[in-house]
Amino acid sequence: MCGRYSFAIDDELIKERFGVTVRSAIYKARYNCAPSQPLAVITNEEPETLNFFRWGLIPFWAEDPSIGYRMINAKAETILEKPSYKTAFRNRRCLVPADSFFEWKKDKDKTPYRIHLKNDVPFAMAGIWDKWKDPEGKIIHSFSIITTSPNSLMEKIHTRMPVILREGDEKTWLGQTGPDELLGLLKPYPAEEMDAYPISKLVNDPKNDREEILKRA
């Protein structure tokens, strides 16, 4: 499961790394991104724009938006089998930019860890998105992060990890690509290129959205 992450880089680095237009009036650095919040995504329909969608997928056919609270992650192994995800996987994919994600080790203290790339560059997690219309006609755009089995670093902390795409695979993920090739991208990121360290339990509360939580405990 991936239930929290950070995306706290400046506008210029976002433009340089992801090649997107950033609306400065909307974007701000986020140190503790949490489900149900509007968060940055780059979609296959608008690959040159940084949009803000609600975290927690609401399928277009859902009766109400509450289902989104249970759909923050989609398992790579079953993504083509689940009605909630398979249409979005085929037609509505996105990048979820981040600079780290957080996971809680399954020990007696439930120690939170920050996981990032060793070179400390921002990365993109593989996501899917959808749009849902309420009875009054209001449209909610939402997304889910795809997870896979853990690599050797992550398995010491948790049983799942988000799919982190290679930079060279990001256009393939957003492009008109067949399902077999897409599924081939949904694999664990190499452990030797990642690092993890324990952080403060301040991260447990999404209201603590400040740089302090990224520090080593």
What positions do the PLM features span?
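Short linear sequence motif anchored by a di-proline
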Residues: M1-A217
